[in-house]
């Protein structure tokens, strides 16, 4: 066992040789390296697999032995200061290592086909491998300085990956936005690290926890300063994990390739903030104000993310806001003291969200030949629909990921989310009500995305899509209400030109006749090239892209079992609790792992009922075209209200839609207050500099010039004249001094 722990340093550095090899290959033999670029996938996957094998081995030993291991090397700078660096292996490290390596392997295999035609193929794999190295280095760090170093490397890799297609202005702006937003958190993290070093004199976790806890209990440190330092550490996690109010970078990060979105949203960047909170939780637990703040930020984020996901048209942005909401659940859990539930949901959500993002990549891959390669078209759910026939495997995997995120048993997220909901009732009923209500919203927006993508018929055919922003599909409301022909207006969904049918209309002017099915029986798209017509069909992805989806399906189905209690010698225990036993004992020495199955069943029925209600409402509004028309009278019986009641209902729907589609106006607020405010301040500073500062300096120079020009005519060039003037002035000064001195005496 000791031998295995000593060589755990291999885990973070295993993927690094691949990145270095690509760099050397492109530098020394660029032509050969580019010609053999598809062969580079194998070493990248192989090296990350080595790290995965080490991680699994360490995890098995920890489950059996329940030990924490730390190996350090001392670096002496001078006689008064030495820095120790090394690796820390505990349950949190092993969980994160397995998560990063397994998701990373799936994403790398998937990317081989997804990025095969991209000119930046090698650059993409180099960035991905270095990102895995940075994240693995972060989770194995033994002190705050190492964490900060790898924290910055993770941020740099995310910047490079988000802006991978840097020639696109939107991608360039997105990576800059992510970078600048995370600078706020990184600056706070650095100040917090320095503050705690000033308090405790140590960067090592165990020394830091013990010294700080003793100081707090003995009133040996100013509580306000300690709270401020802890808050600054938490600010770093808020920015990295896209928590309110530093969440604005997350939806724009979708400008990168889809495999990058899967990696960032599942196992790397957003997980880094959660990891930091989990790692430093012994610090936070002795400061009640910080624990309350963590839970409050988590609740705000989970509700805000869910509401912003309701009306998004971009499939990846919908999943991005879903990630934000689920990270709010994960952040809420440690804030209420539920350390186990936080890590459990981090695991289950990572695999489910990676499955959904890779599934969305398969969908986008099939839509691009039809609507074009612009993200505004290929990722727009308004143009999708009816893909079940052509993407059956992708559809099945996406459905399982959707149901898992909705919290439907026995899929993975059901077990973890239900545990967070149960624990939230013990902490605060208000937080619990918000969390449970958001679970219904989660089911609604996830099923909405699924139905718009796979159900019914290909929507592009109903809109006579022309590929321009003036196409009629922009006048269709996803809320079932006919809207104006503006991009930011209300968007309906199910209409047939020229007769429009609304779920909120007073009467149905036209019924769908039986010939409609014949007219749209073929889901092909007709494109004209040089007076020739070519038919393009949606198609299922290649096996290289489907294999990772199937692998993630297995995780989504079975990874929840690690947290299900089982009977072991008369006591109920689960693998995750046994895995986390040292950490749980460190945080809660008297923790009880017994399970009340009756209470669990009651709470599960309640949470599943909320999810089913959300699924039902989504199916009511976004079901297939045939079922929508067949049930139109039924739907209208609910939503058709006479006079002022209907107007009031429409206004509520418009407010919800505008709030969601415009991202809660938070981006507008930041743009107005910060971007425009800073530009206005810069213009004012420029004006003051040019008019005031430069005016004073230039004015003195001009005054000297004119004075010199005026007095140069006084002199005639005769020395006697200069002496006369000189003596005259001296005489005048002497007279003034004489009269002033004597007048002062007498």
Swiss-Prot record:
Q: Does the keyword Lipoprotein belong to this entry?
A: no
Query: Where does the record say this protein resides?
Result: Plastid, Chloroplast thylakoid membrane
Catalyzed reactions: a plastoquinone + NADH + (n+1) H(+)(in) = a plastoquinol + NAD(+) + n H(+)(out); a plastoquinone + NADPH + (n+1) H(+)(in) = a plastoquinol + NADP(+) + n H(+)(out)
Q: What's the Enzyme Commission number for this chain?
A: 7.1.1.-
Picking any one GO biological process from the record gives: electron transport coupled proton transport
How this chain sits in the membrane, per its record, is: Multi-pass membrane protein
For the protein in the UniProt heading, the enzyme class is translocase
| Record-linked InterPro entries | NADH_UbQ_OxRdtase_chlpt_su5_C, NADHpl_OxRdtase_5_subgr, ND/Mrp_TM, NU5C-like, Proton_antipo_N
SUBUNIT field: NDH is composed of at least 16 different subunits, 5 of which are encoded in the nucleus.
Q: Which PANTHER family match?
A: NADH-UBIQUINONE OXIDOREDUCTASE CHAIN 5
Q: What name does this protein carry? A: NAD(P)H-quinone oxidoreductase subunit 5, chloroplastic
